[in-house]
From Swiss-Prot:
Protein name per Swiss-Prot or TrEMBL: Auxin-responsive protein SAUR27
Other comments on record: Exhibits a high natural sequence polymorphism between cultivars, thus conferring thermo-adaptation to environmental conditions.
Membrane topology: Peripheral membrane protein
Species this protein is from: Arabidopsis thaliana
Chain's role: Functions as a positive effector of cell expansion through modulation of auxin transport. Involved in thermo-responsiveness of plant architecture. Enhances plasma membrane H(+)-ATPase.
Gene: SAUR27
Induction summary: PIF4-dependent regulation by temperature. In low thermo-responsive cultivars (e.g. Col-0), higher expression at 28 degrees Celsius than at 22 degrees Celsius in petioles but not in leaf blades. In high thermo-responsive cultivars (e.g. cv. Alst-1 and cv. Ang-0) higher expression at 28 degrees Celsius than at 22 degrees Celsius in both petioles and leaf blades.
Subcellular location: Cell membrane
InterPro entries: SAUR_fam
Primary location class: membrane
Segments passing through the bilayer: none
PANTHER family assigned: SAUR-LIKE AUXIN-RESPONSIVE PROTEIN FAMILY-RELATED
Amino acid sequence: MALVRSLFVSNKILGGSLAGMRKSTSAPKGFLAVYVGESQKKQRYLVLVSYLSQPLFQDLLSKSEEEFGFDHPMGGLTIPCPEDTFLTVTSRIQG
């Protein structure tokens, strides 16, 4: 089972394994779907749930809480930052 060490553009999966993944609207076990962007059109990414305990990712979550509180317009976790910032943060977490 190969680990994904970079962004797969077609699936937008950060970290973790692609084994057994099917295209669906729900996130596979061990992953969390987040919506990223500052415009109305946000990109959906799947990140490992372990990212939730990372201080860099928690900073992004704090920004989301400040902007949206607990009322997320996308119906899921929305992170209001530029995609390149999000990708920089997640790449630092991946090591």
